[in-house]
């Protein structure tokens, strides 16, 4: 008598999926749509826990080739990875002036992507769409894209004799739990005095996060003996934001230019390198005609070379507008060396003008992402 054999053992092959989300804003986009340049490239971005796999977005405002000249083309490009290729899928959409998603395009199934192989849409959106810019651009002529990428990580197999019910692994709450320590004075062992305000904290956390605090509590200093630290020349609200970062790794108010500048100074003072990078990134993104000169001063003061380069590049592009601002006038009086650097950069750019064709010149001067 024949019959089906019963499986006495089993095996499961599983794959882990990692996701990232990247937002890219291009200023003065209608300018690019009207021109016949080749493409604009975003900054490099990566997964939070895998900086060896890097990506960028590339937009062709007048189409990737002649047959697509009536469209804006958009591609995701894998720049580097530890292996020869990755399996990924992605979707991208436009964020309009109201922050609403529109014109969503997606590649729904996982595809093998090779480094530097364009992966995307040759007909992402028609150029005619920009004849009614309110549909796709903000009032200040910014074009914002939101890109979501899913990457299939290595698969692994699990074997077993008898099926067992799956165990649901709960989300790790460490970040929130440590954040609660900052909100709750229970078990604190030191005081931080800032302009008449007292903040309670934990020496172990301060020492683990900041080399400056560690030195205070390690050596025979007054702070170690009294468990009290007096903080001078720091606004209480800025200090509170810095402490929130120390406990949670988050900074919710970096959208404010003044807060980002003050936090950059505090991060430099207390050796918080990750916070410095976050502030530098926020200040790069918020560069404007009004704050460019002040941003250059801040970047120079705290030796943030990337921010300084971005500020100088911005001033070169908008030299006539920036030179009329109160910030520039103030910098002429207080930091003549930086004014000289800006003029030197501008002179170098003008030399490029005579050495390059007009189209190539424009791309060498104008930032692709502000």
Curated annotation (Swiss-Prot):
User: Gene3D superfamilies from the entry?
Assistant: 6.10.250.3030, 6.20.250.50, Apoptosis, Tumor Necrosis Factor Receptor Associated Protein 2, Chain A (2.60.210.10), Potassium Channel Kv1.1, Chain A (3.30.710.10)
Q: Name one GO biological process term.
A: protein catabolic process
All copies of domain BTB, residue ranges = 188-251
Residue ranges constituting the MATH domain according to the UniProt record:
19-149
Which SUPFAM superfamilies does the record cross-reference, listed alphabetically?
POZ domain, TRAF domain-like
What domain of life?
A: Eukaryota
Q: Which Pfam families match?
A: BTB, MATH_2
Q: Which InterPro entries match?
A: BTB/POZ_dom (IPR000210), MATH/TRAF_dom (IPR002083), SKP1/BTB/POZ_sf (IPR011333), TRAF-like (IPR008974)
Q: Which PANTHER family match?
A: SPECKLE-TYPE POZ PROTEIN (PTHR24413)
Q: What does the sequence similarity comment in the record state about its family?
A: Belongs to the Tdpoz family.
Q: What is this protein called?
A: TD and POZ domain-containing protein 4
The coding gene here is Tdpoz4
């Amino acid at each position: 008598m024949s019959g089906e054999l019963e499986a006495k053992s089993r095996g499961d092959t599983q794959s882990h999926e990692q996701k990232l989300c990247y937002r890219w804003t291009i200023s003065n986009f209608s300018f690019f749509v009207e021109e016949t340049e080749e493409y604009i490239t975003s900054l490099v971005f990566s997964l939070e826990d895998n900086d060896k796999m890097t990506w960028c977005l590339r937009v062709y405002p007048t189409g990737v080739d002649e047959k697509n000249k009536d469209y804006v083309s958009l591609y995701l490009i894998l720049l580097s990875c530890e292996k020869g290729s990755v399996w990924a899928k992605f979707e991208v959409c436009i964020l309009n002036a109201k922050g609403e998603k529109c014109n969503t395009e997606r590649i729904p199934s996982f595809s093998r992507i090779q480094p530097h192989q364009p992966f995307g849409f040759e007909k992402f959106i028609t150029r005619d769409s920009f004849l009614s810019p309110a549909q796709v651009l903000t009032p200040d002529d910014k074009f914002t894209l939101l890109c979501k990428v899913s990457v299939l990580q290595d698969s692994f197999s699990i074997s077993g004799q008898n099926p067992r019910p799956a165990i649901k692994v709960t989300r790790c709450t460490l970040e929130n739990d440590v954040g609660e320590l900052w909100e709750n004075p229970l078990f604190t062992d030191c005081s931080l005095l800032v302009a008449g305000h007292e903040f309670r904290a934990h020496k172990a956390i301060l020492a683990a996060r900041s080399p400056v605090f560690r030195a205070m509590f390690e050596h025979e200093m007054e702070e170690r003996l009294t468990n009290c630290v007096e903080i001078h020349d720091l606004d209480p609200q800025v200090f509170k934001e810095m402490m929130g970062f120390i406990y949670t790794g988050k900074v919710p108010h970096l959208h404010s230019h003044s807060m980002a500048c003050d936090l950059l100074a505090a991060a430099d003072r207390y050796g918080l390198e990750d916070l410095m990078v976050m502030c530098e990134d926020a200040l790069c993104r918020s560069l404007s005609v009004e704050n460019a000169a002040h941003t250059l001063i801040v970047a120079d003061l705290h030796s943030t070379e990337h921010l300084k380069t971005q500020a100088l590049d911005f001033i070169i592009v908008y030299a006539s507008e920036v030179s009329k601002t109160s910030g520039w006038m103030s910098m002429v009086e207080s930091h003549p060396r930086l004014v000289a650097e800006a003029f030197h950069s501008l002179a170098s750019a003008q030399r490029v003008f005579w050495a390059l064709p007009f189209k190539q010149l424009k791309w060498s001067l104008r930032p692709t992402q502000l």
